[in-house]
Design a protein with these regions (language model features):
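Gram-negative outer-membrane beta-barrel transporters
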Residues: 401-408, 498-503, 522-610
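Periplasmic-side early beta-strands and strand-to-turn transitions of outer-membrane beta-barrels
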Residues: 182-283
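Extracytoplasmic beta-strand/coil segments of soluble accessory domains associated
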Residues: 66-109
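Short acidic/polar hinge/loop motifs at secondary-structure boundaries
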Residues: 105-133, 463
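Conserved C-terminal beta-signal and adjacent last beta-strands/turns
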Residues: 8-10, 21, 192, 245-250, ...
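Membrane-embedded beta-barrel scaffold of Gram-negative outer-membrane proteins
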Residues: 301-319, 368, 436, 442-444, ...
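Short, acidic, small-residue-rich periplasmic hinge/interaction motif at the N-terminus
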Residues: 22-58, 95
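N-terminal periplasmic accessory domains that precede
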Residues: 33, 65-68, 86-89, 101, ...
Length: 681
């Protein structure tokens, strides 16, 4: 049915193109001017940064930031399935080593230390950038791998505006996006809403099970892998984002960003589950509010910015199972509440060839975590979890100096306080220089120290938390080259290559104990090193045809170089679990008038599921390649701009796993209709 609908849509697009030919408004083909490195911002001296194009963020309404980063960056996205937990990791580190900020406020869970990128709609993000390795120290501490910086921007509306997108996809998936805007000389207002829902019952071949084939005498004459449906995978996600900006016109801007999440997701059954879906109820619910108030005060040679924010998260996880008597029994009933108060002040001062910056950030976490099905006894007190507070302070000073247009030097000092424990001073040094103006060839180098304090679950989770854990500590070194050539309006070509070397001591790992549960320990010294490559090409093939190609590649060996914990420990010298040694992405976009064809490809090499790098069937996940393609047509009508879009995901119906025993969908389709009324035209 979906394939038939796809063919009908393609025919309809062609007919509509003929009908609308007389009103066809051609897209502007703009090849960007090559950046002159002498004009680069002083704040970016020596920084290894990847900026995600705004067009990529608005590719389609069904995408999360996990989907965007998987196809447009060199970092590893670990997904537990469609619309389930998705985390990102830089350079062979873990997801908890990736710091994530939204409009300046950290949104990593203080309990787990990581961020679920499947819960961040890409349509809610206007600016996204990745700070690799040492560069994350400019933003925050704790990013031993790097940092992801997400933010929103004023809509730049003139009067009232509206945008609506309706998406329909395979597995009865529905995605809806609505944005209302208003703007004048001083005010910019925006309201965005995204709602996504699906039974998510896709088919897959289960290679963890075998069905026997019998003859008439019940002798086994063969076997096959059964085709099953994804069970217990439905979801309903609602996101609301309200933004208000006021610009005085005299150098002051005030802002309010408020984001509400209401999510109800089933957690899919494993490929090794033999029970019926009706025998399980495995569900996670989340209500989250994030709000940020900001004030920016701008003058010709200095800037002052302050922010205040609040996060409230209520999360429930329920697991019920029928043991065989027809009555559901509760196995897990977990509840957690997180309240975070945030404050930040930043200052910048320009003095001739110098830029001085200072920043102070505070996050006060108040966390309550309970499993109401587990009761432990501490003396006469019943304990079902933990209830604790922690203050996190981070302050930094930096001096950036550009003695000439060709050379820049930056020094950063950062200090952090978690609870009542100070980190040692965290220094970072950045240097860059233009080697050749012909080709705009630039060299960059940086070195930094970094620390990451244990999460609240690491310290207090019951059972198993370890309050005696030490912070993870490390040093990271970066060296890179970049170039940019081109001719404005004709073509532009840019690329970069960087080498990184990172050492992390006291790596925290959860290990089994003789008491029957897991507990975290400082056990590893990890050496992560490798290469990151990026390239981008834009070509105007004709006045109405443009081709854009982007690619990334990373080689990231990440080895355990600690001492064996026992004679049976086979992890020393081995690649860390769920860290691919090779990743690559390619995206290509061909634009002709109001038609656009987008192709996306990504690749993850083999990943081990065990620290021993066991070569058994369950010890490793095979290499996989993913191919997606999208065709879009735009229309300009007297009353509105319209867009029709068809996306095919997993184009070649690849069988793959991102996490052991978590089924992933085969080929699937999505269709989108976008409407933007012309109220003031």
């Amino acid at each position: 049915m979906m394939r038939r609908f796809f063919y009908i849509l393609v025919v309809a697009l062609c007919l509509a193109h003929v009908v609308q030919a007389q009103d066809d408004v051609r897209r502007n083909i703009a090849i960007k001017e090559v950046t002159v490195f002498g004009q680069r911002p002083m704040k970016d001296i020596g920084v290894q940064r990847t900026r995600i194009d705004s067009a990529v963020l608005k590719e389609n309404v069904s995408l999360s930031m996990a989907d965007v980063l998987a196809f447009n960056s060199s970092i590893f996205v670990k997904s537990y399935g469609r619309a389930t937990l998705s985390t990102v990791a830089f350079r062979g580190t873990s997801p908890s080593h990736t710091q994530v900020t939204w409009n300046g406020m950290k949104i990593n869970s203080p309990m787990l230390g990581m961020t679920d990128f499947s819960m961040i709609p890409s349509y809610f993000i206007d600016d996204a950038s990745l700070l690799h390795g040492t560069s994350s120290v400019n933003e925050t501490g704790g990013g031993l791998g790097g940092a992801v910086r997400l933010s929103t921007k004023p809509a730049q509306a003139d009067g009232f505006g509206l945008q609506y997108v309706q998406g329909v996809g395979s597995f009865k998936t529905f995605d809806e996006f609505l944005r209302l805007t208003y703007g004048d000389d001083h005010w910019q207002l925006s309201t965005r809403a995204v709602y996504s829902s699906s039974p998510n019952d896709y088919k897959y071949r289960n290679r963890d099970k075998k069905e026997n084939i019998y003859d008439d005498e019940m002798n086994i004459i063969g076997s096959y892998y059964p085709t099953e449906r994804n069970r217990s995978g439905s979801y309903k996600d609602l996101h609301l984002l309200q933004e208000i900006y006021y610009n005085t016109g005299r150098g002051d801007r005030f802002g309010l960003n408020a984001w509400y999440i209401n999510s109800n997701r089933e957690l899919q059954m494993l490929t090794t589950d033999y029970g019926e879906a009706s025998d399980f109820d495995n569900r996670q619910r989340e209500h989250t509010f994030r709000g940020v108030l900001s004030w920016d005060h701008l003058r010709s040679d200095w800037k002052l910015a302050t922010k205040a924010g609040y996060i409230h998260t209520w999360m429930a996880y329920d697991y019920e199972r029928d043991p065989g008597n027809g009555i559901m029994q509760t196995m897990t009933r977990s509840r957690s509440r997180i309240n975070t108060i945030y404050a930040q002040a930043d200052g910048e001062y320009y003095l001739d060839k110098w830029l001085f910056t200072a920043s102070v950030t505070a996050h006060q976490h108040m966390v309550e975590s309970r499993d109401k099905n587990i009761i432990l006894q501490q003396g006469n007190k019943a304990v079902v979890g933990y209830d604790t507070n922690r203050m996190e302070l981070s302050s930094s000073l930096s001096a950036k100096w550009r003695p000439s247009d060709r050379v820049g030097v930056s020094a950063v000092l950062r200090e952090e306080l978690f609870g009542d424990t100070f980190s040692p001073l965290i220094p970072a040094l950045f240097v860059d220089g233009v080697i050749s103006e012909r080709g705009n060839i630039m060299a960059k180098a940086s070195v930094s120290r970094n620390y990451r304090f244990p999460t609240l679950n690491d310290l207090y989770f019951l059972p198993g938390g370890n309050p005696d854990l030490k912070p993870e500590r490390g040093w990271t070194y970066d060296v890179g080259l970049s170039f940019a050539v081109g001719c404005e309006g004709v073509y532009s070509l840019s690329g970069s290559a960087s080498w990184f070397d990172s050492y992390v001591s006291d790596w925290i790992l959860w290990l089994p104990t003789t008491k029957g549960f897991f507990s975290p320990r400082n056990v590893k010294d990890v050496h992560a090193y490798g290469v990151e490559l990026q390239s981008s090409l834009d070509v105007a093939l004709s006045p109405s045809v443009q081709l854009s190609l982007d690619g990334t590649y990373s080689w990231t060996p990440s080895r355990n170089e600690g001492e064996p914990m026992s004679p049976a420990d086979k992890s020393v010298g081995k690649q860390l679990p769920y860290v691919p040694e090779h990743t690559a992405t390619v995206t290509g976009r061909l634009t002709w008038r109001t038609w656009s064809l987008l192709y996306k490809w990504n690749y993850y090499s083999e990943r081990y599921t065990m620290s021993s790098n066991d070569l058994s069937l369950s010890g490793r996940l095979p290499t996989y390649y993913m191919n997606n393609i999208t065709l879009e047509k735009g229309f300009s009508l007297p009353w509105a701009d319209l867009s029709l879009k068809c996306a095919i995901n997993n184009l070649f119906d690849e069988e793959y796993l991102s996490v052991l025993s978590r089924p992933m969908p085969g080929i699937n389709y999505e269709f989108f209709l976008g409407i933007t009324p012309k109220w003031k035209r």
